[in-house]
Amino acid sequence: MNIYVVRKATQGLANYIIKAGKQDKGVAIAYDSRRMSPEFSMEAALCLAANGIKAYRFESLRPTPELSFAVRYLDCVAGINVTASHNPPEYNGYKVYWEDGAQITPPHDQGIMAEVKAITDFADTKTMDMVEAKKKGLLVTIGSEVDDAYMGELKKLILNQDAIDKYGKDLKIVYTPLHGTGNIPVSYTHLTLPTNS
């Protein structure tokens, strides 16, 4: 993957969104810790901005479920995740989600691919200067507000908070995201476990 592939894929997505008349809703963008993920996600954001579509880009890496949440929380038409999931680390990938927060399915997948394939010249892809995109409000950085909302929704799913309150301080937990993206949402500031400190 390279910036030209990212730009072509994003231009196809932008064209599809514009033809659907949903360009005012924006697109949420997340990325993982793979090589060039931050750069590729910014390239996607600037292509969207150049097409007049607001790009909401996470300030740092985030997991896929949080992107899915952000698409719905921010009322976006789509989401982009720059990741190759479980594939070897030398690879990267580009996944698209629709406004329901799920990966694209028919007819959207076929419609987006048709738009991508219709781009036969890279001169037909657009980009914008980052400073200009921010100034025009077309590039918005997603920070802790979405993290907090996401964790708030997850906490609503707790089945027995009393058990956590009673026994949580005695649990010894070791967690590592390895090379993954769980380091932000799984931090002590977001966990509901009481501490001994």
What is each of the regions a protein language model found here?
Residues 83, 87-89, 124-128, 197:
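Core alpha/beta catalytic barrel or barrel-like domain that forms the active/cofactor pocket
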Residues 189-195:
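Conserved small/polar residues in nucleotide/adenosyl-binding loops
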Residues 3, 34, 56-57, 98, ...:
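Hydrophobic alpha-helical scaffolding
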Residues 1-44, 143-170, 181:
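An N-terminal, well-structured beta->alpha segment
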Residues 183-188:
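Carboxylate/His-rich catalytic cores and anion/metal-binding grooves
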Residues 103-153, 158-159:
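Long, well-ordered, tryptophan-enriched scaffold segments
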Residues 21-99:
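Ferredoxin-reductase
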